[in-house]
């Protein structure tokens, strides 16, 4: 399945070519000359992306510390398909140019011409980017843009565990709230329990950040005991401690897998498709709110409070989308969902056909309270509010039209 199909049966496809132009060619300077330190990279015309095949793939893997491969279906003969593939290749070329000195390589694997290589490498999903680092294979499930891809690969190059050794690093750790995070307290890097933790971190790197400390003062502030690991759900203030310390790699991985779907999670460019594919029975509860907007901020704070009060409910998971993070998708979302994203919204979306139903705000001046949101969410979870209800309303409208005939 193509990446663009995932947000509602090819619904994003009409935006993709325009998006690719912007992402590759960049924002025009409008006559202003670039200043030193603010020159955005422009493609220099050097071919760095390699067509990976049966003859060269072993040498390509030996050459790079990290290798990103776009596994693609052959472009069709029509002009639009050819142009789109060229733009995708340009995104890879620009990313390869930026990361050339970092030891990151880029390649293309054709699903028909290079099927044997794809099979050996375990490439299965067309139009996906697979990242190879050592023995790890990471499927990139984010926005296909040069800047997002570069940022992701820079994270891949980092160690899977970040050490906290002082007050500033501890403050930075505590400021992370919009994603899952783990932290463990160990005796030293040579500890077998730290090594198990490090191996577990590699399984989720770079999507889930793992932190560790060997400093007893830092551990005391975090109320961590030796060999203890705390798991923080996104937007939650209090952690869960992984039971039965010290933990093996398998125990840590199992715990994270069981708890990785947060009650409230943010849709991010670098992991947007992974998040969207992780639905509950074919639906998502989706909230749109601009954090920088006063109403959006207030609505988001209410969402956080509701999530914190209901974190024990495994059936509740809300995806928060900040429209500012996806400006080119705002017109598509407004048209598809028939909503106004200049104001906060919360609704239920069917991931198969993008059908949706949205909470009615009784008074546009007053945002829903935590109690009103909880009541609405309870109705959703009990099936009293669902996208089929909206279909029934549409059918009734159609019947009325037929009667008029």
From Swiss-Prot:
Detected in skeletal muscle (at protein level). Detected in skeletal muscle. One of its GO terms (biological process) is protein polymerization. It is a peripheral membrane protein. The modification Phosphoserine is found at residues 81, 216. N-glycosylated. Its main location: endoplasmic reticulum. It is found in: Endoplasmic reticulum; Sarcoplasmic reticulum; Sarcoplasmic reticulum lumen; Sarcoplasmic reticulum membrane. Keywords: Calcium, Endoplasmic reticulum, Glycoprotein, Membrane, Metal-binding, Mitochondrion, Muscle protein, Phosphoprotein, Sarcoplasmic reticulum, Signal. The modification Phosphotyrosine is found at residue 43. Disruption phenotype: Mice are viable and fertile, but have a lower body weight than wild-type, due to a reduction in fast-twitch muscle mass. Fast-twitch muscle from mutant mice exhibits slower contraction kinetics and requires more time to achieve peak tension and to achieve half-relaxation after a contraction. Fast-twitch muscle fibers from mutant mice show a strikingly altered structure of the calcium release units in the sarcoplasmic reticulum with a strongly increased number of ryanodine receptors, plus narrower sarcoplasmic reticulum cisternae. Residues 1-34 form the signal peptide. Belongs to the calsequestrin family. Calsequestrin is a high-capacity, moderate affinity, calcium-binding protein and thus acts as an internal calcium store in muscle. Calcium ions are bound by clusters of acidic residues at the protein surface, often at the interface between subunits. Can bind around 80 Ca(2+) ions. Regulates the release of lumenal Ca(2+) via the calcium release channel RYR1; this plays an important role in triggering muscle contraction. Negatively regulates store-operated Ca(2+) entry (SOCE) activity. This is Calsequestrin-1. It comes from Mus musculus. The lineage of its organism: Eukaryota, Metazoa, Chordata, Craniata, Vertebrata.
